[in-house]
Amino acid sequence: MTTIRIGVIGTGVMGTDHVETISKSIARAEVRAVADIDVGRAEAVAARIPGAKALSSAEALIESAEIDAVIIASSNPTHGPYTLASIAAGKPVLCEKPLAETAAECEQILRAEETAGTRLVQIGFMRRYDPGYVELRARVASGEIGAPLLAHCVHRNVSVPPLWTSEDIVLTSAVHEIDVMPWVFGREVVNVNWFSPVPNAPGVRRDPQVAILELEGGALIFIELFMAANYGYEIRCEIVGEKGTIELAPVSRTVARSDLRVQVDLAADWRPRFAEAYRRELQSWVNAILSWNSGDLNNVSGPVHGPDAWDGYRAAVIAEALVASMSSGGPVPVESLAIPGLYQQGRS
C-alpha cells in the first residue's frame, strides 16, 4: 500500500479542515469519502476534492472496502460508537477529542483494543505536534531550568457556544492542557482542584475557570480557562523551574509600532494558531499507518505513534475529577486503571 485512503466522518469546521489539509499538504494520503448527518454539507465538501464521494452514513464509510483509515470529527456523543466500529472493522482511526463522552466509555475502547491485540486508535491531541510545545518539552527534559516546579497556562477564546455548561468547558477545552502538560513534565496527574470567580452576570456557566493539577512529585499546573474573553484566541504557557523559566513564544508574525502604540494581531479561533500542529499530526498518523502496513517490527503494537486510547482515557478521568471538584468545592484525587500492557510499549 503506497497511499492511505482516508474517510472523514463529520464535515463541520474540524472535519472540513482535515479534508483540506490532507488534500493539500499530506503526502501518501487521499480523502476518498466523507459522511455527515447533513448530507448536503457532506456532498459539498466531497465535490471540492477530486476522487472523493459523500457516503450515506458513518457506518457505510467505516465498512467501505475503499477506505483504509478513518478520521472521526463528528459530534462528541458519536466518538465512542464510531471508534468502536472502526476497531471492529480493523481500521486505524484518528478520533478528535474527546475519545468518548465518559471515562467509562473510554474504558470500553481500551478493552476493545486489548481484545483485538492492536492499538488502532489515535486521539487528536494536536498540541503534542505543535513546534512550541515540542521544544518546551525538550528543554524541560534537558534540565536547563533545573527541576520543573510549576506551570502557568492560559487558554482563552473569543466566545463560547451558547449551550455550553461549566462542565463542557472542562470536558471539551481544558482537556488540551490536561493532556499536554503531563506530557511536557513527564509526570502523571494525581490530584486536581477547580475554582471560579463569582460571575458578574450569573448564567448557564462559570467562566472564567481555574484548574489546578498536582503531578507526581508535587509539581503544580495552573490553568486559566476563559471561553468568552472577547478580544481574541490566545494560548500561553510558562514553566517555572529551580534555575529559570521557559515559555511559549508569541506566535504573531508581525508587530506594529505607531501612534505611541505597539500592536499584534490575534486569531479569532484555534485554527491559525495550531495549523502546523494539525499538519504534523496528520502526516505522522499517515506515516505510522504506512509503517505498520509494511510490517515494521518497531511498530508491532499498531499504527499509532502519537497519543493513543490510553491517553484519551486518562484525559477523561482527569476531566471528570475536575468536574467532581466543581461540585464538591475541594480537591479530588485522580483514580484510574493501571495501564494495560498493550499501552506500555513505546510510551515516552
What are these regions (language model features)?
Residues P77, A100-V160:
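A contiguous active-site-proximal alpha/beta segment in oxidoreductase catalytic domains
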Residues T172-T254, R279-D296, I339-S348:
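Contiguous beta-strand/loop segments that form the cofactor/metal-binding neighborhood of enzyme cores
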Residues H18, I49-A112, G346:
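Beta-loop-alpha module in the N-terminal Rossmann-like domain of NAD(P)-dependent dehydrogenases
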Residues M1-I49:
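N-terminal Rossmann-like dinucleotide-binding module
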Residues S56, C95, E101, V121-I123, ...:
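Hydrophobic residues in well-ordered beta-strands that form the structural core
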Residues M1, A69-I71, A288-S348:
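C-terminal helix-rich "cap/oligomerization" subdomain common to oxidoreductases
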Residues D17, I37, N230, W270-Q283, ...:
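Active-site loop of classical SDR/Rossmann-like NAD(P)-dependent oxidoreductases
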Residues G124-G132, N157-N193, R206-D207, D311:
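Mid-domain beta-loop-alpha active-site segment that forms a flexible
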